[in-house]
A protein has these predicted regions:
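Short, ordered loop/turn segments at secondary-structure junctions
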Residues: 69-71, 79, 108-109, 134-137, ...
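General beta-strand structural signal in soluble alpha/beta enzymes
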Residues: 105, 131-134, 155-158, 189, ...
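Adenosine-phosphate binding glycine-rich loop
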Residues: 158, 282-390
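Solvent-exposed alpha-helices and their adjacent loops that cap or buttress functional pockets
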Residues: 12, 55-60, 96-97, 122-124, ...
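Rossmann-like adenosine-cofactor binding region
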Residues: 232-301, 307-309
Length: 390
């Protein structure tokens, strides 16, 4: 199938992938008076007395804003907010289909951090959570940081944290399969953008000690010239031996490669220099850092990509719907590391020890168990970590 042509045709037919459907019928005078004036004044007064009643008297309890500025849309780059709308609508469809969450796309016409933060913060009272999408690095880090400080609802940049949650889930099962522990392995990553940095931070919270991040200029280490503040922060806690050189230099002896960068950056020759039973996450889309066949021919034991036509797809749809479902169910004030880790373990648990093999370390995107298992784990973690409000 020519997905580009067929998708364009469908979008012309759909004229948008979302619509509003009322929950209150207004088919007679009495019903109208209850849903709108004069009856609607009473719930307004209740919310005026206690703003948290907005969760009980409106749809806020189940509604998430999906926010972008259109600067890093899929592999298309900076295409603008309006051009990003089809992706945001699609994300909203996934929220509903896979999490039962109502989501509203908000495409902001500004690249200014303060503009975006102020816009979202002023609208936060209309939503139960905020999902930041396709905002370029390093601005995405500052936008998320400021919004988390200003908003008392979950703010979650899926390009960072959704990818990190799925990667951790897959890694937990891959390490189990090859008999290694996260605290003992050497991991080398390619790509120092939003996803790459979030992955490293989450893995380090799980006990990872030996990790080297690389970018276009090679290994990142403390003191390297030209690092932006975000890379300086990660350099201070990674690459403890201050290894220098290219990806090919530092990947020697590594147990795990995690790529969120560009097509073809990892070669079979590089894989052959890695440790026995190497694990490869080649998540660049649509063309991975290395294709599974080449990686396995070079000695890799487990290979995961971001593509649906290969086994072990790293697909964020396994994470964000259930994470928000769980956070909304307990009216969490934030989505913290404890909740992310709980989601990773929940996803990993859906692959039983009997089923676990080199081509099956992650459940399928359409596995009907995912939402409920992830939501329950996230809600419980929110309660235990003190961010649940009901």
């Amino acid at each position: 199938m020519d997905y580009a042509a067929e998708s364009l045709k469908k979008h012309y037919e759909w004229k948008g992938k979302l619509e509003m459907t009322p929950r209150a019928a207004v088919d007679n005078k009495e019903a109208l008076s209850l849903a709108y004036t004069p009856g609607v004044a009473q719930p307004c007064l209740e919310i005026q007395k206690d703003v948290n009643k907005s969760y009980e008297l409106t749809r806020r309890w189940n509604t998430v804003a999906v926010v972008t500025d259109g600067t890093a849309v899929l592999g298309l780059g900076d295409i603008g907010p309006e051009a990003g709308m089809p992706v945001m609508e699609g994300k909203c469809v996934l929220f509903k289909a896979f999490g039962g969450v109502d989501a509203v796309p908000l495409c902001v016409r500004s690249k200014n951090v303060d503009d975006i933060v102020n816009t979202v913060a002023m609208l936060a009272g209309s939503f139960g959570g905020v999902s930041l999408e396709d905002i370029s690095a390093p601005r995405c880090f500052e936008i998320e940081k400021q919004l988390k400080e200003r908003c008392d609802i979950p703010v979650f940049h899926d390009d960072q944290h959704g990818t990190a949650v799925i990667t951790l889930a897959g890694l937990l099962n891959a390490l189990k399969l090859v008999g290694k522990k996260i605290e003992d392995v050497k991991i080398v990553t390619s790509g120092a953008g939003a996803a790459g940095i979030a992955i490293i931070k989450l893995l380090m919270s799980m006990g990872l000690k030996n990790v080297i991040m690389t970018d276009r200029k090679g290994a990142i280490y403390e003191g390297r010239e030209g690092l932006n503040p975000i890379k300086e922060e990660i350099a201070a806690v990674t690459n403890r031996n201050r290894e220098t050189g290219t990806l090919a230099d530092v990947i020697r002896g590594a147990d795990v490669f995690i790529g969120v960068s560009a097509p073809g950056v990892l070669t079979g020759e590089m894989v052959s220099t890695m440790a026995k039973d190497a694990i490869i996450f080649a998540c660049a889309n649509p063309t991975p850092e290395i294709f599974p066949d080449e990686a396995k021919a070079a000695g890799a034991a487990v290979v995961s990509t971001g593509r649906s036509d290969y086994p072990n797809q790293v697909n964020n749809v396994l994470a964000f719907p259930g994470i928000f479902r769980g956070a909304l169910d307990v009216r969490a004030s934030e989505i913290n590391d404890e909740m992310k880790v709980a989601a990773s373990y929940a996803i990993a648990s859906l692959v039983s020890d009997e089923e676990l093999n080199a081509d099956y370390i992650l459940p399928a995107a359409f596995d009907p168990r995912v939402k409920d298992v992830v939501a329950a784990a996230v809600a419980e973690a929110a309660r235990k970590s003190g961010v649940a409000r009901i």
